[in-house]
């Protein structure tokens, strides 16, 4: 199967592609090239960086921020800023406080304290990323959304978020049944819920649970959501990726391919290069063994940084346009 043929699309529904792996393996370059290729195929594509240490702007050589920026006719990009996301919630809270009664104000003051804690708590990055996922999931504004993810640990926390939130909402619903209006302030701790005193807390919690269930269904639908694991031919990257795929399986998220990046050519007149090549050949055999049920694609080690759309399109040629080995080596040398 050609690597490009593994993509699946449902008419009128957004496809989600997560690109992940160990830090430093080239996730952003692969994500950017994938998004460019999809956009060039006529798909309205959004690429989202969920990594707190963003490098998407550097990869595309375009200034990108917290709000979507148009890169070309079909490509849009955003770098999630959790601080800005929290600031937006604080502004919305202040607006509500200006119209609140004394009783409501007490609850909103409590919410403000919780938001302050949440902004500094572990998981704030993942909460902001999950909110973006919910937003694009429900809007179907884009044909495809590519997530350029943070290193493995962050990404697993992001993808476990629906399970965590489902448990949290369930407990809040029980608390609501037991305590009644005492949970009116607590309901707003959930990052993607609006505090609206005119709507019953139980109804809002039930709606939130429904939204989370929909998110879980989308994430576990292999026709809509897939994970592409980027590795390099080194043991630490391979074993971490193997563990990550096992964790993704627990959340019913399909890993449909392995992209092996930074594969060296055999340069026989360079002892160091030849030694590295021989070591990589052993690691490539290990990859074939570990991931025998996956589609595996190889990307060569370029002599220059792969950044900017021109060089990313060279990566597109190799990854998605089926260049043979001679053409690959020629492109590597000429970059």
Predicted regions and their residues:
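Short, flexible segments with low predicted structural confidence
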Residues: 104-105, 191, 212-213, 219-220
């Amino acid at each position: 199967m050609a690597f490009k043929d593994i993509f699946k699309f449902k008419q009128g529904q957004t496809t989600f592609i997560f690109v992940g792996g160990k830090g430093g393996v080239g996730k952003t370059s692969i994500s950017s090239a994938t998004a460019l290729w999809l956009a060039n195929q006529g798909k309205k594509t959004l690429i989202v960086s969920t990594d707190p240490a963003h490098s998407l702007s550097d990869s595309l050589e375009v200034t990108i921020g917290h709000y979507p920026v148009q890169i070309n006719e079909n490509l849009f990009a955003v770098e999630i800023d959790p601080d800005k996301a929290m600031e937006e919630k604080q502004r919305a809270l202040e607006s509500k406080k200006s119209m609140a009664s004394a009783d409501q104000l007490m609850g909103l003051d409590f919410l403000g304290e919780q938001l302050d804690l949440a902004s500094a708590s572990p998981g704030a990055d993942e909460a902001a990323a999950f909110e973006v996922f919910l937003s694009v999931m429900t809007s179907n504004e884009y044909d495809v959304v590519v997530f350029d993810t943070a290193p493995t640990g962050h990404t697993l926390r992001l993808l476990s978020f629906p399970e965590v939130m489902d448990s949290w909402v369930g407990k809040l619903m029980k608390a609501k049944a037991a305590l009644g209006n005492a949970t009116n302030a607590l309901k707003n701790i959930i990052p993607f819920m609006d505090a609206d005193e005119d709507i019953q807390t139980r109804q809002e919690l039930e709606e939130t649970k429904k939204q989370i269930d929909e998110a879980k269904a989308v994430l576990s639908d292999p026709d809509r959501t897939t994970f592409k694991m980027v590795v390099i031919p080194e043991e630490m990257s391979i074993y971490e990726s193997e563990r990550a795929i096992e964790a993704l399986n627990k959340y019913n998220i399909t890993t449909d391919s392995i992209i092996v990046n930074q594969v060296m050519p055999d340069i026989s007149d360079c002892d160091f290069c030849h030694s590295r090549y021989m070591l990589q050949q052993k690691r490539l055999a290990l990859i074939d063994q570990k991931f025998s049920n996956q589609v595996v694609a190889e990307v060569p080690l370029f002599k220059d940084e792969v950044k900017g759309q021109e060089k990313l399109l060279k990566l597109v040629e190799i990854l998605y346009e089926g260049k043979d080995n001679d053409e690959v080596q020629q492109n590597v040398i000429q970059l």
